[in-house]
Amino acid sequence: MAQQSTAAKRKDKAKKRIVVIEPTGQVHIRASFNNIIISVTNSTGQVISWASAGKMGFRGSKKNTPYAAQVAAQNCAQVAFEGGMRKCEVFVKGPGSGRESAIRTIQNAGIEVLTIKDVTPMPHNGCRPPKKRRV
């Protein structure tokens, strides 16, 4: 008879994870043709903050612009800097525009970039690419 309501059960499951923010971390930038996603993690890979162009309010073709990447990177870097991160390694993946502007914005936010690695997956002649657009 002493049964918890479903709302109380959901609150128990939705506990906020406690992530340790270290002075040195990682920034993962995923730049596709349609969007850009930026994740700031600690050295073990736990996400401290994340942002995307879509989350920042950009829609459609405006999501893959360098300005959208700049706004998303600013949001992410600000949360990480306030948490105590001062240095980072940057991992860039994907062919999209806005990769350089995101890195520049992270540096301007006060986080020193130690290394920049391009981890874009390259096929050894795998899947057939999409056909060329005809406008």
Swiss-Prot record:
Alphabetical list of Pfam families matching this protein: Ribosomal_S11
Signal peptide: none
A cellular component annotation (GO) from this entry: ribosome
Disulfide-bond pairs as recorded: none
Gene this protein is translated from: rpsK
Molecular-function annotations in GO: rRNA binding; structural constituent of ribosome
Domain of life: Bacteria
A Gene Ontology BP annotation from the UniProt entry: translation
Source organism (scientific name): Cytophaga hutchinsonii (strain ATCC 33406 / DSM 1761 / CIP 103989 / NBRC 15051 / NCIMB 9469 / D465)
Keyword Hydrolase attributed: no
Name by which UniProt lists this protein: Small ribosomal subunit protein uS11
Quaternary structure and interacting proteins, as annotated: Part of the 30S ribosomal subunit. Interacts with proteins S7 and S18. Binds to IF-3.
UniProt KW keywords: Ribonucleoprotein, Ribosomal protein, RNA-binding, rRNA-binding
Keyword Lipoprotein: no
Function as written in the Swiss-Prot or TrEMBL entry: Located on the platform of the 30S subunit, it bridges several disparate RNA helices of the 16S rRNA. Forms part of the Shine-Dalgarno cleft in the 70S ribosome.
Entry similarity comment: Belongs to the universal ribosomal protein uS11 family.
InterPro entries reported for this sequence: Ribosomal_uS11 (IPR001971), Ribosomal_uS11_bac-type (IPR019981), Ribosomal_uS11_CS (IPR018102), Ribosomal_uS11_sf (IPR036967)
